[in-house]
């Protein structure tokens, strides 16, 4: 996959365009993010439609990209902003405007069609910032 194509996936993701999953994920894709695991395009769509996008604005930034043709490795910075007060989210209770910041490395394995068949997420940091501006390192959130 060319870097420009990968960055188009990120652009569409940032727009909450879940049809990007149809275009970029293999039908049997496997995702591992800490202790959270799910499979397939439907698993990815469910995760974002139910667990993330109703509760958070999520924006991805990719400052570094490398590829050997069958794997893509990136440095990922992700910023989550709580849309509203909520007692139940994937990260626990949140208040509107509170943020979570992920800094990590993600490895994508590509199938023969150039689609993501395996995605592995590794954490450097996951920081919660309260409505009062207090920052707390959460380690791996799930």
Give the ranges of each region predicted by the language model.
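C-terminal and inter-domain tail/linker signature
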Residues: 1-142
């Amino acid at each position: 996959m060319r870097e420009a194509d990968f960055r188009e996936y990120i652009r569409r993701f940032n727009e909450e365009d879940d049809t990007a999953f149809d275009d970029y994920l293999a039908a049997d894709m496997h995702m591992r993010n800490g202790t959270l695991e799910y499979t397939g395009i439907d698993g990815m769509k469910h995760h974002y439609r139910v667990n993330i996008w109703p509760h958070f604005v999520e924006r991805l930034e990719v400052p570094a990209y490398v590829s050997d043709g069958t794997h893509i490795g990136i440095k990922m910075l992700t910023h989550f902003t709580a849309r509203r007060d909520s007692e139940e989210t994937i990260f626990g209770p949140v208040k509107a405007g509170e943020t979570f910041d992920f800094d990590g490395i993600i490895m994508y394995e590509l199938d023969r069609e150039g689609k993501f068949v395996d995605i592995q997420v590794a954490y450097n940091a996951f920081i919660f910032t309260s409505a009062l501006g207090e920052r707390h390192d959460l380690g791996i959130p799930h």
